[in-house]
UniProtKB/Swiss-Prot annotation:
EC numbers: 2.7.7.18
Keyword Nucleotidyltransferase: yes
Similarity annotation: Belongs to the NadD family.
PANTHER family reported for this sequence: NICOTINATE-NUCLEOTIDE ADENYLYLTRANSFERASE-RELATED, PHOSPHOPANTETHEINE ADENYLYLTRANSFERASE
This protein's encoding gene: nadD
Name of protein: Probable nicotinate-nucleotide adenylyltransferase
NCBIfam families for the chain: cyt_tran_rel, nicotinate (nicotinamide) nucleotide adenylyltransferase
Length: 174
């Protein structure tokens, strides 16, 4: 994991945002697979202060950030950003995309999302503008195998771990 300045030499950036509530092995598998799919990209992991489509987080933002910090140590192509957490509100993805495009001016900016998010992407703030600014990297989710999306995206396959923080919270009775 690196500092913000280390990103400047990368022409390709990828953003992977989420609640990470809690962080689990599928999140880490997605990070590994994204780095493999995009060998020249720097990956910015972007924990949300609050996901605009979900109820408030179980774990506070500081705890989630620290969990990610520990898990991402020793990953030189990964940057952990607190941009959304510092806003102390739900931040639309387009706002984060514009922020990182202005900050680093990458030639290509990828957005890593789940197939479940792709299904309702049209309901996101300024979705049309978002799709003009990014290339999508979409990871599989159980129950979303048949993606109905007319645009181009890079499929991210081979995530063997179940991907559900909400299922983990439910098993803990939270």
């Amino acid at each position: 994991m690196n500092t913000m300045n280390s990103v400047l030499k990368y022409k390709e950036l990828a953003l992977y945002g989420g609640s990470f509530d809690p962080l689990h092995k599928a999140h880490l598998a997605i990070i590994d697979q994204t780095l493999e799919l995009l060998p020249f990209a720097k990956l910015i992991v972007l924990p949300a202060y609050q996901n605009p489509f979900k109820k408030p987080c179980f774990l506070d933002a500081k705890t989630r950030f620290k969990e990610l910090e520990r898990a991402l140590k020793g990953m030189p192509r990964v940057l952990l950003s607190d941009f959304e957490i510092k806003q102390e509100r739900a931040v639309p993805t387009i706002e984060s995309v514009i922020f990182f495009q202005k900050l680093y001016r990458p030639k290509t900016l990828y957005l890593v999302i789940g197939a479940d998010c792709l299904r309702h992407l049209s309901s996101w703030t300024n979705a049309t503008e978002l799709l003009k600014r990014v290339e999508l990297v979409v990871f599989e989710r159980i129950g979303y195998e048949e993606i109905q999306f007319k645009g181009h995206y890079h499929p991210l396959k081979g995530i063997d771990a179940p991907i559900s923080s909400s299922a983990i919270r439910a098993s803990l009775g939270v």
